[in-house]
Amino acid sequence: MSTTNSKLTRVADNIRILSAAMVEKAKSGHPGGAMGGADFITVLFTEFLRYDPDNMAYPYRDRFFLDPGHMSPMLYSTLALAGHYSTEDLQSLRQWGSVTPGHPEVDVMRGVENTSGPLGQGHAMALGAAIAERFMAARFGEWMAHKTYAYISDGAVEEEISQGVGRIAGHLGLSNFVMYYDSNNIQLSTKVDEVMTENVAMKYEAWGWNVLSIDGHNINEIREALVAAESETERPTLIIGHTVMGKGAKGPAGESFENKVSTHGQPLTAAGADFAATVKNLGGDAENPFAVFAESREVFAERREALKEWAAKQAAVEKSWRAEHKDLARKLDDFLSGKLPEIDYKSIEMKADVATRAASATVLGVFAEKIDNMIVASADLSNSDKTDGYLKKTKAFTKGDFSGKFFQAGVSELTMACVANGMALHGGVIPVCGTFFVFSDYMKPAVRLSALMRLHVVYVWTHDSFRVGEDGPTHQPVEHEAQIRLMEHLRNHHDERSMLVLRPADGDETVMAWKLAVEEHRPVALVLSRQNIKTLPTLGAIRREEAAQVAKGGYVVMDAAKPAAVLIATGSEVATLVEGAELLAAEGIPVRVVNVSSEGLFRDQPRSYQESVLPAGVARYGMTSGLPVNLRGLVGENGVIHGLDHFGWSAPYKVLDEKFGYNGATVAAEVKKMLGK
């Protein structure tokens, strides 16, 4: 073994000890996988991964995405040796207020690129980052090119999302994407061969990947594989590293305690191993398991100096490029800062009485010409979810050509959403992804991580109600609005509502809802109709100006001097309330109609504004095409809500409107009954 390799093995053993010690101290966690993966992460971080140690947010750094978040001790230990976590941080694993949570949460300044935990999502986010890198390089040059590395486990390969990642990365020929598969044949409750017998290498080769199989504990083989991955220009690379779970673990009698299912998800001592003997076997001090080896200090100090030299050279290249491309440099700065171009939303022409998905297409057409760093994706529905309003003015990504701004994800909603998260994590782009609202069920795990990570991803969900019609109940969302609006009640770690959910009521409001969506910093859902909706009336002269009040979450669209009742809805039901209000007015019953596109946004307004829109002491009536609970917080326990508490049926939507009572006559009758008239 060469001197360099022997030092790297010592570093890897240091990471094994630190990982096991962290879990022992926390009395919970996953030591075995971290001990098995230590060799690969050592070589990657000490010889290949390029970043600026003095500016961890350097935009053109290589990215490392950890998919199996339960292996966080391995990542934290490595980053601690690199100088980004303290010993105290490691000793606080999984404790209240620590910066080392059980599963990593995005913390770029310490080297954590992504929040991970739900298996499969991490490497799908890495795919998104790799696509974003190609998008940026296509516009500003290969001087900013960088690699995206993903670390996956057997569990991620088993997760269905791996199909989407494998297919898309291979199809697009993402040679900047390198994935390490830690194959140790162990998972939480079984050995892998008890649940999977497929040939993983052949599967990825069929998808068009460059597949390399190595001994994941052999420093030379790891290095050679990473060199080969760096030189690959046509395909993404999968390195299959065959490793040993609990590498170096010893039992009470000094016997090997490697390759055991029991060491996957609990401290070594709880699994039956001898922690002190394990530390000693790995060359450490059982009395001081958090000690940093001299070899680790030396290797990482040398790497830090090499990285600083690399960063200085990169800075010089960028400086020269900026001097020669001043206009492009300004655009790059706008991309990275999130600065948006000036857009006159009031001048966007909109036909009357359009479906809000069609209105969205019009806005996206404007964005395609104005917002150069927006990437729009669709899961094989662009001509139905109307994201084709964007596509018609650009083109989709293809292998070797990322000059367009559209990502055809194919039928893979969860993968698409995770890819959008990865794009947002990479930075410099605004990701948008569209599909039918009912298929948001496939996306919820990724939407949840969007909210947890506070990522600016825009979800366009169309065909928002039973008015999908003839396709029937499998395609008619009923409970979905209630589910996604719960995210407005769930607060993120910045004490904000973790998501903004907007269901605009007509074409003009859709325009202004899009304005909110692109100016946000959190994830946004736009829930849009399949069918045409009548343009709402105005209290003043210009509907578009009144629609701008969507920024307050809710506002009055039709009023009376002394309303006997307040009628509340979102989306297409607002127009139905207007129809009912006109019938009531003809009978001498004055009412107010309130449109609440986002209850969360509305509740964030001053109480005085909320009370001016929904005055106390006035009867309230609500209509929703979803579950009645959608409006319970606005209507109150004493009000009446017309909603659905059952699945839909297959029939033309106008027939369903009649059968389910979604018309002005029903509104008028139910309001009169509520008022005792």
Language-model features and meaning:
Residues Y149, I375, V566-I568:
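Conserved beta-strand elements of the Class I
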Residues L66-D67, S153, I214, S378, ...:
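Small/polar loops that bind or transfer phosphate-bearing groups
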Residues A150-Y151, M179, A377, Y621:
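Residue-level marker for buried hydrophobic side chains located in beta-strands
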Residues M1-K147, E298, E302-V527, N532-I533, ...:
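Thiamine diphosphate
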Residues G128, H146-E159:
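DG-centered beta-turn motif at the end of beta-strands
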Residues T278-A312:
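Non-catalytic, alpha-helical, charged scaffold/linker segments
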